[in-house]
Amino acid sequence: MRKFLATATLSLMVPAYAAAEPLSVCVFDVIGANGDVFNVMKDYALEVKSLGVDLELKPYTDEGVAVGDFNAGQCDAVAATDLRTRPFNKFTGTISAVGALPSYDNLETLLATLAQPKAASFMKQEGYEVLGIFPVGAGYLFVNDRSINTAGALAGKRMATLEYQKDAIHMVDYVKATVVPSDITNFAGKFNNGSVDTAYAPAFAYEALELYKGIEPNGGVVDYPLAQLTVQLIARDDKLDDEKAQKAREAAWGMHGQVMSLIDSQESAIPDEKWIRIPDSDIVGYQEMFRENRLEMRDGVNGAPSVYDARMLKLMANIRCASNPGAAECTAANRE
């Protein structure tokens, strides 16, 4: 009898073991295995282990190599910024559209919506699936001169711009600044050594990438979120069944509070006197400028690249108007 029970128990364990087959993940973190993104992914791996998903994390400090290895089949999934994962899912890749989510409350509402089962169909595109979305903080403009505090003041300034970020290049051209082609591994060095006048990054870069050096002695950080940046976990859509994929997204959403606490500590680490405050009257104008640019980059008109998903832009517009119904955009004829 004991032998029968033991055999039966082992037979029941086999499917569970098979379901926990490892899923290798190329993880981009500019700091490497000791960085905040990699640590968040380690916590996420613990969360999904109970689902029978055993993540094997491989750290990469070069995002292009991480995505390249994923494309080459060296990893089953990749965790990278949405600027790089946009080709795998244009819908979620549009979260970082310029000026589309002016507050963290707006971002929270969006991510809560995307974690629901009814959004599952939007998480798949052409053989790939989004398994998790993790905020890395709002993107701010770091400047070497505090007088660079308006869109007009950017004219002629040298801006470190990611070569593959077509929307940023369009915006830099729009404000008549000068694009200095860069990537995530070298933009900080260019800003810190004075090769460029401005750089665009989340608050973590102030200390982690030593951008505090680049703003000395007369610069600062413009206190306006140009975009909400995220790291997205993308896998081939045959790696997890629909139920596990949905639970994986819910696990990522369940970590939102933890991740936002980390972002809050990173923003708090920037001394108050280093922030450059923008008058509310100016912000209204900037929001309309960004909206016009989003429409151009949705439709691919006026020389703009077509990089934004209309469905995501509409969803984010609905979220903005729910939180600020009096905004002019909410009754505009060309509302997103």
Predicted stretch roles:
Residues 81-175, 211, 225-335:
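Contiguous mixed-secondary-structure segments that line small-molecule binding/active-site clefts
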Residues 1-4:
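Positively charged n-region of N-terminal signal peptides that target proteins for export
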Residues 16-20:
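Boundary at the C-terminal end of the N-terminal hydrophobic targeting segment
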Residues 7-15:
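Bacterial N-terminal signal peptides
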Residues 21-86, 320:
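General N-terminal leader/first-domain-start detector
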Residues 178, 182-214, 222-229:
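Glycine- and acidic-residue-rich phosphate-binding/metal-coordinating active-site segment common to enzymes
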Residues 58-97, 142-144, 199, 203-215:
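Pocket-flanking alpha-helical
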